[in-house]
């Protein structure tokens, strides 16, 4: 077969024979195929040669270059846009409105057929005669001359050329007898005479069927040891011999394999990438159409990995990705396919399952494996994996639909936060659309001054005194009104808006404090929650100090709240940052104490001032003795470390009295007050009637 591109543009026309393993196409002079047009990108497309196990050759066209950069216009084949497309004879490639490229696979022998894409296949004429030719490096083998007409001198010269050619040449008859080997063959393949027809170069080259064409040239690739050879097998017409010409293509194969690896594998994890995954998924779906088994697509993400990357750098995050790969690879089956999808997400194709329950059990086992700490330089790091799941045939029957729906399922888990995994559901489509709209509105909310701060009082019930407030963000949407924090806090994290919004919270709360300063005690403090992304931002400390200075707020008025899970992500880095914050006089509080998986020994390590007992322990304290016992132990522990203790979620006086009897002094919750707007908290302070909460 002859493979070629016929380029047709207003400025030039050209025919390019395809012989190499890879071609880059674009307007930049460094490309293999240069098309000097401003309408296309500098590196618009890449053409890759592939040879399957049957030695059939095909060419794939990929949008952009092999480093993942896409073209401006895209690559359009037969009127449809494609990222990666296997070309068949007659395909029309459009790089812009006025540049078309025709792909042709032209038989070089009358018996050859044009094969390929089934319904996609179109037969088109060879257009090369109408265009100027590129320089072709090709040897044409025509009908043999009558050697009897050559002189003895010419015959001697011809024999010498063959005998001393650096390229091996072998001749056999149709009975498998070796009739000629040149010197190069004997040197490169010393065992060929001994192995005879069992030698890789001679195996299967004698036609077995009577209807084999009487004259044709066949090409195949042969691997011998670690070497690759291209063998051209010539069956001359009306001849009793078969001749082979052998060329060493090892270097070319190494380059091809390298290019294939770069195009379809992730260099960090050595896993297949998204392009190869989509190809393999398409093949699996085409083979499973008439089977009763269920396929599962599992998209895995990690809540803290991006923050870890920001805090500790790419090298640590890369090391964690490698460990994740090792763990996942050790727990997937041979028939399953694991790939790195993008960034910190992985995708898994689970095959041959009987039902959704079997897939769910498999996913739960994987997530349990990922809960174990990751040790980097002997320091434990904890990540929380989560997964979206879509299945064939329940949730879709083609590649694009399944990938779209597994992505929607993953976003659902990410937004909810409390779940580790979920299957795709039809209702998620509308939820996904709402999420996109909400995300768009969030980008405008900060500019339009739509965020508000509310404050929940913290009361010392022993003295009946207001000792601080916790700042809580709210969003006043122009259409939907007051939006629940549960609907947008997660989106602030995933979009990265939490960083500028977090700065706005501090700046606004510090400004509001100056309105209250005359009415509060000297130890009154403002508690502000930090998200994982904020805490792991490399410029957190200078940002806080700058805003404190700009607001003229003494550092001891600020109490930074972080959760146990944030503390545990990187012990050494956390300790360094907390020590730095405390050295500037900033107070530190561990939120949701008792709900995570930290070691109690870390209370001795980290310089916290306050522990906050989570509402999950306080809500049933009147009816659950075990909760009361846990809280009493926390209070004893906190007092032993000279820590301030705050109980959250106090909704009625009996709760408060029970906690006070156990030794807790500071509390917050709806019994004292709902979160109050800036105007309401100002009035609350002015009223000053906190003695009604005194239990001492």
From Swiss-Prot:
What is the protein named? Uncharacterized protein sll1895
What taxonomic classification does the UniProt entry list for its organism? Bacteria, Bacillati, Cyanobacteriota, Cyanophyceae, Synechococcales
Q: Which SUPFAM superfamilies match?
A: EAL domain-like, Nucleotide cyclase, SMAD/FHA domain
A molecular function GO annotation: cyclic-guanylate-specific phosphodiesterase activity
Q: Name one GO cellular component term.
A: plasma membrane
NCBIfam families from the UniProt entry: GGDEF
- List the Gene3D superfamilies: 2.60.200.20, 3.30.70.270, EAL domain
- Tell me which Pfam families the record gives: EAL (PF00563), FHA (PF00498), GGDEF (PF00990)
Q: Which residues form the EAL domain?
A: 435-689
Looking at the record, the residues that make up the GGDEF domain are 293-426
Q: Which residues cross the membrane?
A: none
